[in-house]
Swiss-Prot record:
Location of this chain's protein in the cell: Secreted
Keyword Methyltransferase: no
Residues of the Ig-like V-type domain: 22-113, 114-206, 207-299, 300-397, 398-495
Disulfide bonds: C49-C93, C139-C182, C232-C279, C325-C374, C423-C470
Protein name per its UniProtKB record: Alpha-1B-glycoprotein
Keyword set includes Transmembrane: no
Keywords assigned: Disulfide bond, Glycoprotein, Immunoglobulin domain, Repeat, Secreted, Signal
A GO biological-process term: immune response-regulating signaling pathway
One cellular component (GO) term of this entry: blood microparticle
Amino acid sequence: MSMLVVFLLLWGVTWGPVTEAAIFYETQPSLWAESESLLKPLANVTLTCQAHLETPDFQLFKNGVAQEPVHLDSPAIKHQFLLTGDTQGRYRCRSGLSTGWTQLSKLLELTGPKSLPAPWLSMAPVSWITPGLKTTAVCRGVLRGVTFLLRREGDHEFLEVPEAQEDVEATFPVHQPGNYSCSYRTDGEGALSEPSATVTIEELAAPPPPVLMHHGESSQVLHPGNKVTLTCVAPLSGVDFQLRRGEKELLVPRSSTSPDRIFFHLNAVALGDGGHYTCRYRLHDNQNGWSGDSAPVELILSDETLPAPEFSPEPESGRALRLRCLAPLEGARFALVREDRGGRRVHRFQSPAGTEALFELHNISVADSANYSCVYVDLKPPFGGSAPSERLELHVDGPPPRPQLRATWSGAVLAGRDAVLRCEGPIPDVTFELLREGETKAVKTVRTPGAAANLELIFVGPQHAGNYRCRYRSWVPHTFESELSDPVELLVAES
């Protein structure tokens, strides 16, 4: 195949030749407080750090600052820290691993003597209710032996459970939508703790849609006989999945590595198998209640029996390009194909009424550098497809646009809390990095398929105060690195 050579000397742009299942073990330790007397719950307090595996090493953190680590003579499953002096503060702990330390425990906050710290409220497995689903509210406190209470906004009564002697959390069934919070008390007549943050429960007539994905060869222009794998992911585990094309269920081989997803295997696609595929799921306890359909995934097949289309670029004003694909057939389905070091895949689809499809690329940057071509397929039997057009190479020089960094809080962050900074850029599927002013090594790195990421500083202390910037980078299919964002200042307050 010949290569069309075109040079676009605008804005530095040049056209030229060209499953195995994973097993995970929970290691995060648990941290709770115990008091000599629940009548004076914040006097003579002992913090217990419990690991998942026996270890001789434990460490406590207070207000974001590490305390002296403890090394025991023999491994233990837990260790108790006796608090002395001013016990008010925010605590976390970690336990030893053969290769270092575990992640930090969840936050435990001890307030002043006149109030009990708020518990945490979460919903399991999801924050919605629907027929056939058993949703529960989990209220996690600070002290053992307390009584937990759940409240729905607008209700006058609490849903109360007995004392949680052996744990610091309680579970409540949730049957109604609304805004929920929970509290606890240390004795039957005692004052309530501060309420937890509010969690909203929605009532849905049907479960929300899953996500259907295809990767690798499945996202290319397919040929008869190719194998395709489609992955359907639900927002919860233990459901029944279904693959559909249009309104027809497809009974195809399937496999799974996790209870929240399924792999559908199309082992030998044929002409006519192109088009839109969706998936859905239903709960085991509601066999008639299917979720909404996923967003469709489109497959395109070509036997390359039809003539190749004509493919040409048309520069537009600004950082934009229009790619024209012309076929000798009306009413065809067109596909713009991108090829780079990451592989060859369909970039976009169009179904124009005539014989010409116009694909527009806006805000072009170095991330758009690739080889492009187009194909078309006949939507009528026998569903023939074209050979690919001549390839065009787009080469863009220069760094990509700078990202923006913003804080998700206002004012100062309390020592011992988490600080979340959001870095936003124009290019998806990149790695975001957070850097402290004057340092070259990233303090936080997040890989994301999107064009933005939350960069979280866990359990900040005075040592974390300062200015931060972010950037994004990529190694595949192209190696590039953005400039640093404008700075955002992190202030840390003790109280």
